[in-house]
């Protein structure tokens, strides 16, 4: 009802003293009166280029009226501890087979290296023992024919040094094979010891012992 009276007062249709008195004392009516004038000026095109609006009070009031949201605290859940892959039962079963396959692979690699080394050394020794081809010098010197000369090959290396090199290489190969065999035996003994400890621990479980005594 008051808005209609304010609109009529703004248009000059009525003049109410009580309405003017209320308008001077009521801030809400003053805001409505200002809004009406702004709307009319906008419709007529009488508004300035820059408009100043103070909406801070409305924003603060809207923030205060918003309900407070209560967020429940998050309860951390217990996470399972990561299991090491070495302690998995599947790995305990596969470990002996993997160790044997590894040993076989290492043995094959060592044998291949020995064979290739021996063949390479034999090939080098054969090429070093071949005599040089004779060279015939038939070019004339100072317009005169020179006699044909036959190049004599140099003396071959002594056979004793070559045999010593072969023996030294064989000794090294035998030492490598002996070292590998020793490492393989130590590894197999360690695996057998670990398997025996595992079986002994499985036999000494308290539940199994009590069942055995009750059956007796």
Curated annotation (Swiss-Prot):
Q: Where is this site: Cleavage?
A: 108-109, 148-149
Alphabetically ordered keywords of this record: Cell inner membrane, Cell membrane, Coiled coil, Membrane, Signal-anchor, Transmembrane, Transmembrane helix
Region annotation Disordered: residue ranges?
Answer: 147-166
Membrane spanning residue stretches: 105-121
Gene Ontology MF terms: sigma factor antagonist activity
Which Pfam families has this protein been placed in? RseA_C, RseA_N
Q: Which segments does the topology annotation call Periplasmic?
A: 122-216
The answer to keyword Coiled coil applying to this record is: yes
Kindly state one GO CC term assigned in the UniProt record. plasma membrane
Q: Which GO terms describe its biological process?
A: cellular stress response to acid chemical
- Cytoplasmic side of the membrane: what ranges? 1-104
Q: Does the keyword Transferase apply?
A: no
Null-mutant phenotype, please?
Answer: Derepression and constitutive activation of sigma-E function, consequently loss of acid stress response.
Could you state what the record's PTM comment says about this protein? Sequentially cleaved by DegS (a site-1 protease) in its periplasmic domain between Val-148 and Ser-149, then by RseP (a site-2 protease) between positions Ala-108 and Cys-109. The N-terminal fragment is then degraded by primarily ClpX-ClpP in an ATP-dependent fashion. Sequential cleavage by DegS, RseP and ClpX-ClpP frees RpoE from RseA.
Positions of disulphide bridges: none
**Coiled-coil annotated spans:** 161-202
Primary residence:
membrane
Function in brief = An anti-sigma factor for extracytoplasmic function (ECF) sigma factor sigma-E (RpoE). ECF sigma factors are held in an inactive form by an anti-sigma factor until released by regulated intramembrane proteolysis (RIP). RIP occurs when an extracytoplasmic signal (periplasmic or acid stress or heat shock) triggers a concerted proteolytic cascade to transmit information and elicit cellular responses.
Q: Belongs to which family?
A: Belongs to the RseA family.
List, alphabetically, the PANTHER family matched: ANTI-SIGMA-E FACTOR RSEA, PTHR38104
**What is the name of the protein in this document?**
Anti-sigma-E factor RseA
Gene, per the UniProt record: rseA
